[in-house]
């Protein structure tokens, strides 16, 4: 940490000589000693600002500018002061007066007790040095606290990994960064190895049901895509664009289900960075499914309204890309933002209301409701699932009783499978009904 240099009497006399040598030969003074004192203090301020650059860089290295508290406000004041005099070689009375005004404007009455310029300048120097020292002490302590905290977290993770190598652990034993549901008390895995996570697919724990519901559905939809759809009569009767839309939806559904399996398989990794990547993949899969579901409706429903269809698909596609990008932001996987995540995906799904309302307006309520019947069933399934998931029902009422079977996340998984199945039946129906609906062909 930087310290302030103290001046001996010999150095003080040297300053006086330097200051007197700076005076113009025609400069007239009433009291030479007062002027020497005044310029001596100015020179000390000049020296303070010269050293400020190095000390501010040190504070920046300690991460002080990233804080959002009073210390950061003081740092910003000093940074602005430093920027105001960047490149200035020697201060004069005008520049010092500017510093005094800035201090008085920001800190009100701190200089009010001083009635002379030298007194104010000396007080300002003391004030600035005091605050800078406080910042340096604060930054060093914060750095030490962070290092201590990181050591503590590392110890907790290592302890949990040792327990996880022997048995399933409890929520209390699980490091807080891995918490996702405060009402699921037991049955947690915690491994240092990806291989152990993968092998745990075949073991019994609180993620087994979540893994196998979506893994089974993934296999079913893969079979549909790879065999049943290409060998069906609808493949033969469909044009290329209809095939592309159906394949696009099936791939998006499989992506959602597959990413979910990856997340629930590797959510037990003790490497936080890798665990978070698995979580992000889950969110990316959800975004892809929502966007693909809406686009599959827009493509068929507005086939005879080309410009409108293009606008809707472009809008939904853009939101889908945002949904694929946003989960990779650092804050997105934190539990305290869980409600934000839910509202984000609900909002993404609600973007489909715009084309739906347009369909009601253009084609009428009865025709639209009949045409979108499978979609409404799909939406209803998703809504039920979101309610259970968002409210932690039923485990919030009986914590620990639904750790392995019957908790809200498992209900949400079933709701997703049902919703995807309903929507897929809708996509198949759209291929035969879209002309009658969109183009008015009877």
From Swiss-Prot:
GO terms for cellular component: endoplasmic reticulum; endoplasmic reticulum membrane. The chain crosses the membrane at residues 209-229, 247-267, 284-304, 308-328, 342-362, 374-394, 402-422. Keywords: Membrane, Transmembrane, Transmembrane helix. It is a multi-pass membrane protein. InterPro entries: AdipoR/HlyIII-related. It is found in: Membrane. This is Uncharacterized protein C30D11.11.
């Amino acid at each position: 940490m930087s310290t302030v240099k103290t001046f001996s009497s010999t150095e003080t006399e040297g300053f006086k000589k330097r200051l007197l040598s700076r005076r113009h030969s025609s400069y007239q003074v009433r009291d030479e000693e007062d002027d020497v004192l005044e310029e001596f203090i100015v020179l000390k301020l000049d020296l303070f600002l010269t050293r400020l650059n190095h000390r501010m860089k040190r504070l920046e290295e300690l991460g002080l500018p990233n804080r959002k508290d009073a210390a950061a406000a003081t740092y910003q004041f000093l940074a602005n002061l430093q920027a105001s005099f960047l490149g200035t070689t020697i201060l004069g009375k005008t520049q010092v007066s500017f510093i005094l005004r800035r201090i008085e404007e920001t800190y009100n009455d701190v200089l009010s007790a001083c009635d002379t310029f030298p007194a104010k300048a000396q007080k300002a120097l003391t004030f600035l040095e005091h605050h800078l020292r406080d910042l340096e002490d604060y930054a060093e302590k914060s750095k030490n606290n962070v290092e201590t905290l990181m050591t503590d977290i590392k110890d907790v993770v290592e302890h949990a990994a040792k327990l996880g190598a022997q048995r399933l652990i409890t929520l209390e034993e699980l490091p807080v960064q891995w918490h996702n549901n405060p009402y699921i008390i037991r049955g947690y895995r915690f491994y240092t190895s990806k291989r152990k996570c993968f092998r745990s697919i075949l073991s019994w724990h609180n993620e087994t049901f979540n893994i196998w519901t979506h893994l089974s559905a993934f296999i079913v939809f893969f079979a549909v895509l790879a065999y049943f759809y290409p060998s069906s009569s609808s493949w033969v009767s469909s044009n290329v664009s209809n095939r592309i839309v159906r394949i696009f939806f099936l791939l998006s559904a499989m992506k959602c289900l597959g990413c979910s399996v990856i997340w629930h398989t590797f959510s037990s990794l003790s490497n936080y960075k890798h665990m978070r990547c698995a979580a992000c993949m889950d969110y990316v899969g959800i975004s892809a499914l929502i966007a693909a579901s809406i686009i599959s409706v827009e493509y068929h429903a507005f086939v005879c309204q080309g410009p409108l269809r293009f606008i809707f698909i472009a809008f939904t596609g853009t939101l889908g890309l945002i949904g694929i990008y946003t989960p990779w932001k650092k804050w997105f996987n934190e539990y305290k933002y869980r409600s934000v995540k839910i509202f984000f995906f609900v909002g993404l799904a609600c973007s489909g209301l715009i084309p739906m309302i347009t369909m009601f307006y253009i084609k009428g309520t009865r025709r639209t409701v009949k045409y979108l019947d499978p979609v409404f069933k799909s939406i209803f399934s998703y809504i039920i699932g979101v309610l259970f998931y968002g409210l932690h029902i039923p485990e919030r009422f009986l914590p620990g009783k639904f750790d392995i079977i019957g908790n809200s996340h498992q209900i949400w998984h079933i709701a997703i499978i049902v919703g995807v199945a309903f929507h897929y039946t809708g996509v198949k129906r759209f291929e035969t009904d879209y002309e009658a609906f969109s183009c008015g062909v009877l």
